[in-house]
Amino acid sequence: MKQRIGRCVACIALVIVLAACSEPLVEPRAPRTPTAVIDRYNAIVATAEAGDDLLMRARAYYDRGNIWFEQQNYTEAIADYDRALALDPSMSRAFHNRGLAYALLKEYDAALRDYAQAIHLDPAYRRAYENRVRLLEELTASTPDETLLQQLADDYGSLARLIPEAEAPYRYRQGLILVRLNDRTAAREAFDAAIRARPQHVDALYERALLHYAVGDLNAALADLDTALRLSPRAANAYYARGLIRHAQGDPRSAIADFGQALLLRPDYPEALIARAATYAEQGNITAARADLKRLDELQLDPALQPARETLRIRINAP
């Protein structure tokens, strides 16, 4: 009995902390007395334009661009970053900040190009990776694009290397993206790395168990779920997954117990109801199977689960 295993994906919170002047905040803050501030930077630009130092002039444009950004005038910010980069194309932070401005204007292709150039110029530029990840997560949330998903997985890997203290959550997220790409081998390696970095990472243990289950390595899957449940004994999805594995191992009594525990923790868990009802039916306990089917009928069922319910109904000859 192979059911699609529902996931409870815990996504890491990407907190982008940028310096107030040298780099704008991702989330624009309230504008500050715009006229007085911008006038001061206009004067700095005018002074730089009167001189012969092109790098000083580029820096003046860059600094004024950051002020425009803080005032949420992203068009003017981009114009100043353009001027700065025309004079000094090695300014990785100007590319990064222009990418932020483009992203806020929903010009996503331009934003991705600028993030890529910032990273090309400075391969250890953490903020550029973090903000590109933020944008790629948004772009791939509802419309999967294989190229963007692969870039996202690669970026999580880069962040795991650049920020060793955060390796576990970044490798976990990388694994989830690789699962979406159906790259099970690479996903397994990412979850392995997450668990090495944090052996008590329950979500990584759960996801790795699903991969073991998918390739038929039931003992390894069971071991990961046992560990996950010792660490988090109220994880309904882990009980459900372990029930599937025990059923596949020919242990229906233990499977029913696990499905029951999942339902104690989450009474409206439709997959667990379907699995337990089917197992009851296999054991000849039609009364219990019909009771679970009745509970299913009281739920607003996802359309993807409705065929399984109707197959179950026919199987137990329920009206």
Language-model region placement:
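Terminal, low-structured helical/coil segments at or just beyond the last alpha-helical repeat
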Residues: 282, 287-319
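Conserved structural position within tetratricopeptide repeats
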Residues: 46, 52, 83-86, 117-120, ...
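Register position in tetratricopeptide repeats
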Residues: 70, 104, 131, 138-139, ...
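Helix-start (N-cap) detector for alpha-helical repeat units in TPR-like alpha-solenoids
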Residues: 58, 92-93, 126-127, 167-169, ...
